Amino acid sequence: MKPDMTVNLAGLELRNPVMTASGTFGYGREFADYVDLEKIGAFVTKGLSLKPRPGNPTPRIVETPGGMLNAIGLQNVGIEAFIAEKVPFLARVNTPAIVNFFGSTPEEYAELAGRLDEIPQVAGLEVNISCPNVKQGGIVFGTDPACAGQVVAACRRATKKPLIVKLSPNVTDVVVMAQACADAGADALSLINTLTGMAIDLKSRKPVLANITGGLSGPAIKPVALRMVWQVSRAVQVPLIGIGGITSATDALEFILAGASAVQVGTASFITPSASQEIAQGMERWLEEHGVARVSDLVGALEC
């Protein structure tokens, strides 16, 4: 008998625990020719803002040992174009679409959450708190528990949809941040976002990225991500989504053991567009081969 791969994630019924990560899968349609969307649990759109954003100047992507740095700058079409141009595709897909979004003030976050709450094709929301708070001198929401709590509480009041908060690893104590977000009303937490890094061109003596710094993703960050998922899983009661360097079914299952109920596949999709589907299928094979009846039986089953 085939293992049960289904997951209930904060009210979202997923056919399996594999999702795609924001910023690596467009709005879903871009990858539909390469991935059978009905073979993955859910997909997460690239980050959305109230107004369109052109993003950062180039170069804004560079390969690094074991990963990549990106400084895309949250380029996106804005909420109006998203509703007019992207939502019709979501209506044709039988897989939950989760919209990642961000703002520069708690009020902007709340306004976006309210607008997205009105769209039936949007199954859930993922809040990107790795953005500067323009009202408080540019401090990044996701590095201050009070600021993060304000954003999450504002979004919680604006929507009844499942609310996932994406945590930054660029903090002193990720557990404190996780607790603040959970206490403010997050239904689930996804972690980790990218680590801040940079690359230098020795010949020109200049940064490779026009933005100087960028977000590091890929296999290089997996050990950090695993550690943070494990730490947070021991401290909060809400379900977790593990992110960071997942390129195989084995990687994904390690995150499940560490305490994640689901995972997101990001950078791997740039290398192999069908990576998320292949990882989901590989997880099912592993469970079958090892006599595990339900993937949920492995959540937090790490033996320490």
Swiss-Prot record:
PROSITE patterns: DHODEHASE_1, DHODEHASE_2. One of its GO terms (biological process) is 'de novo' UMP biosynthetic process. Transmembrane segments: none annotated. Pathway: Pyrimidine metabolism; UMP biosynthesis via de novo pathway; orotate from (S)-dihydroorotate (NAD(+) route): step 1/1. InterPro entries: Aldolase_TIM, DHO_dehydrogenase, DHOD_1B, Dihydroorotate_DH_1, Dihydroorotate_DH_1_2, Dihydroorotate_DH_cat, Dihydroorotate_DH_CS, Dihydroorotate_DH_I. It is found in: Cytoplasm. Substrate binds at K46, N70, A71, I72, G73, L74, N128, N193, T194. Binds 1 FMN per subunit. The keyword Cell membrane does not apply. GO terms for molecular function: dihydroorotate dehydrogenase (NAD+) activity. Disulfide bonds: none annotated. Its EC number is 1.3.1.14. Pfam families: DHO_dh (PF01180). The active site is at C131 (nucleophile). Its main location: cytoplasm. Heterotetramer of 2 PyrK and 2 PyrD type B subunits. This is Dihydroorotate dehydrogenase B (NAD(+)), catalytic subunit. It comes from Pelobacter propionicus (strain DSM 2379 / NBRC 103807 / OttBd1).
